[in-house]
Amino acid sequence: MATSMLGSVRGPRPFGLANLFHRQPPRDAWERVRRLPGPSAVRRSVAAASGPGIPGSHLYCLELLRKRDYESYLCSLLFPAECQRSASALRAFNVELAQVKDSVSEKTIGLMRMQFWKKAVEDMYCDNPPHQPVAIELWKAVKKHNLTKRWLMRIIDEREKNLDDKAYRSMQELENYAENTQGSLLYLTLEVLGVKDLHADHAASHIGKAQGIVTCLRATPYHSSRRQVFLPMDVCVQHGVSQEDFLRRNQDKNVRDVVYDIASQAHLHLKHARSFHRSVPAEAFPAFLQTVSLEDYLKKIQRVDFDIFHPSLQQKNMLLPLSLYIQSWRKRY
């Protein structure tokens, strides 16, 4: 039997995730969601937009998000109008760094790209950003919100260390990586929203860890197709599972137990972040809209009994825009 912080269970293993809908959404909710910019509108705007720096740099970021991080793209559209541009710049910056590892054939090239971004961030704080769309938009966000350079550099440093194709040695190591990347990104997002609050920071830390864990799980089928496994080794050893089991897409119970334990840890971080939501300023809630997609994935993997390779886990949730809008309207996370 799988044993995690949720305890031993038999048969279907419920997380006990809270129901998303406690109140009736506004009657025109779907109409409002339909008015969000669609892919074609973004592409037309990219071609037509102009502004200081590089013409269309903001909409370049939106298009990058739409293609590479659709959930963040949707979330950025639900930020307060005065924060949308900066929020999308931060997320586009994260995408630029995240795709380095998968887009280079040699670690040396990856290190060179990370060095470019380190210098770019240093130059932003000297009002001399490189002529690159994401860098231009990030520079504007830095100037507008006085963003903390330490968080930006910490994301780059952690992504750089992660260029090695090695599995996480432990769950703690995965959580540290998530805190230094996703957590730092959320701290910056709170700065964009003008939120300075210890409870909000505490929630950001737990949600960032949940995001990192879920991202690791979601990417496992892709990584296994490239003969790579990054799931925490200590959890695998505990259940007698080898990397080869994941490469062969083994669906034995002990493999599912590994996935269950890892998913349980993400659920616990979400649960803890939500346990003190009444102490978090409502102004911080847009930063935490991603909890909708995290909860959606955890529910889906629970329904397939933690079969991480089940085809349904790779399908887009067509109701995600509506769910995000309702969560935004409810001012909950």
UniProtKB/Swiss-Prot annotation:
GO BP, sorted A to Z: biosynthetic process; mitochondrial respiratory chain complex I assembly
Species of origin: Mus musculus
Gene Ontology cellular component annotations, sorted alphabetically: mitochondrial inner membrane; mitochondrion
Transit peptide interval: 1-44
Family: Belongs to the NDUFAF6 family.
Signal peptide: none
UniProt keyword annotations, A-Z: Membrane, Mitochondrion, Mitochondrion inner membrane, Transit peptide
Gene3D superfamilies, A to Z: Farnesyl Diphosphate Synthase (1.10.600.10)
Cited function: Involved in the assembly of mitochondrial NADH:ubiquinone oxidoreductase complex (complex I) at early stages. May play a role in the biogenesis of complex I subunit MT-ND1.
Localisation per UniProt entry: Mitochondrion inner membrane
Alphabetized InterPro entries for the sequence: Isoprenoid_synthase_dom_sf, Squ/phyt_synthse
Protein name: NADH dehydrogenase (ubiquinone) complex I, assembly factor 6
Key word Transit peptide present: yes
Domain of life: Eukaryota
